[in-house]
Amino acid sequence: VYDRWRNTNNNSLVVKVSFGNASFLFPGDIMAEAEKELVELAGADLACTVLLVPHHGSRSSSTQSFLATVQPEIAVISAGWKNRFRFPHPTVLQAYQKEGCRILRTDRQGAITISTDGDQLTVAPFILSDDPPGAD
């Protein structure tokens, strides 16, 4: 049997949640191949206010086409502090910065809570500094 998604990361469930004028896109660990297909199938419907950055900020995701389509205001990167993969990748950070996104990172800010009333977003990182835990 031919598996068009040879990497199981591309089988991740992708969910978009909308409430009023706010929307959140959770693309799991998808990679460039799945991003391309999503852009082709959903197009502008992928646009969101908050994006959980695909695959923890791996350079195998967050293609220019995907970012241009999704156009997030806030990009949240879920990555462990000093993780062995060194996520997020510097080129991914640069891509989101170039798009003008506010970047939040769990490796630096710990748990991040984002809530909305449908119009305004409230962002509450556990650690208010951009310095990673234990930094002196």
Question: Model-predicted segments: where are they?
Answer:
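Cap/insert and terminal regions of metallo-dependent hydrolase folds
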Residues: 35-110
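Core dinuclear metal-dependent hydrolase active-site scaffold
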Residues: 1-50, 108-136
